[in-house]
Amino acid sequence: MFSKLAHLQRFAVLSRGVHSSVASATSVATKKTVQGPPTSDDIFEREYKYGAHNYHPLPVALERGKGIYLWDVEGRKYFDFLSSYSAVNQGHCHPKIVNALKSQVDKLTLTSRAFYNNVLGEYEEYITKLFNYHKVLPMNTGVEAGETACKLARKWGYTVKGIQKYKAKIVFAAGNFWGRTLSAISSSTDPTSYDGFGPFMPGFDIIPYNDLPALERALQDPNVAAFMVEPIQGEAGVVVPDPGYLMGVRELCTRHQVLFIADEIQTGLARTGRWLAVDYENVRPDIVLLGKALSGGLYPVSAVLCDDDIMLTIKPGEHGSTYGGNPLGCRVAIAALEVLEEENLAENADKLGIILRNELMKLPSDVVTAVRGKGLLNAIVIKETKDWDAWKVCLRLRDNGLLAKPTHGDIIRFAPPLVIKEDELRESIEIINKTILSF
């Protein structure tokens, strides 16, 4: 009987497939006597042995990235069609962002918020003017931004709306994903996220996504302080709501004095072809959450944007983070935002996203049953059979030189860095087409 480690090693070797561009360069005997850099199999084995088993990565071991490309430890080159879940919208290791990090890292990296630093205010002024909000609360990760929004909503509910203390409720849409802390999974409808981790956060209600009548019923409760929603549900499989949904959300929240919280951590920052996905319907949320591409993938940076009547309900000592607003993260975030502006990446995402979806819709319907998305946040739904499923498609895409990852079993997300050019996109489409037709 195989041990778990032996089983993993066997799985990794089999699932990596045969790369036609790479022949076995050394014999088994040579490998035993010659020390060299770790192989992909070495890396799979080491992670399995020493790391927690809380992820199921596609078996590819990466060591370098530039722009839209990644290279593994054997030197194979790939198109990146995940963009680290839309964290590298500006492309891997964008020189402007890298140089900003390098210029700051030798000066000052962390002061905590016990003292002022000379970069935070510059960043705060830039991002608030860019998105037209009074204030920003800087954090590090996306889930921290979500937690911050929930605290703001509750505090606002008590101090402004007049909800009885500790009775405030926040409404979420089914299928949401904003992290894996206890608060985040308390709002989740995905058993993989929440099963076995209760008891859960009280005061969280869940309604169907893209369902305005359900939202209207939920907001009849005077204890509801906020509705938090993704303009497009990313982790759920790039679920795009009906036209007018976000306008309806804005109208209902205004009517019932409820905060509209837009989770733009994956959809924002040019990914969908607009600076924010809510811009498609010209609505202004009360609170906006940003993260991921806010640093271009170089450093964890997130942000919560809102106006004074909400932000100033939190007083000194009531919320914060040792690393939130540190000068290194702020300098990186300024550069990352400037790249999005200077290179017109929202416009590029809009234009190329239309091309991508038009081509994906030509794929055979007996394999691909749906195509959806906006800008360069897209997904296909794979019809699973005994011969293929989304995981097998992603393995073959990898073998053909393109990296993507399944979500929720039968869905593959296609989200390349926004710096991709049309000829590169069309080359990628050829790989996708070739792969799908091979099943």
From Swiss-Prot:
Q: What is the effect of changing residue 104 to R?
A: In HOGA; loss of protein stability; loss of ornithine aminotransferase activity
Cross-referenced CDD domains: OAT_like
GO CC terms in record: cytoplasm; mitochondrial matrix; mitochondrion; nucleoplasm
Highest taxon of source: Eukaryota
Question: Where does the transit peptide start and end?
Answer: 1-25, 1-35
Phenotypic consequence of residue 271 to K: In HOGA; no effect on protein abundance; loss of ornithine aminotransferase activity
Mutagenesis or variant effect for residue 436 to N: In HOGA; loss of protein stability; loss of ornithine aminotransferase activity
Which residues are modified to N6-succinyllysine?
102, 107, 362, 405
Q: What is the effect of changing residue 241 to L?
A: In HOGA; no effect on protein abundance
Q: What is the effect of changing residue 89 to K?
A: In HOGA; no effect on protein abundance
What is the protein named?
Ornithine aminotransferase, mitochondrial
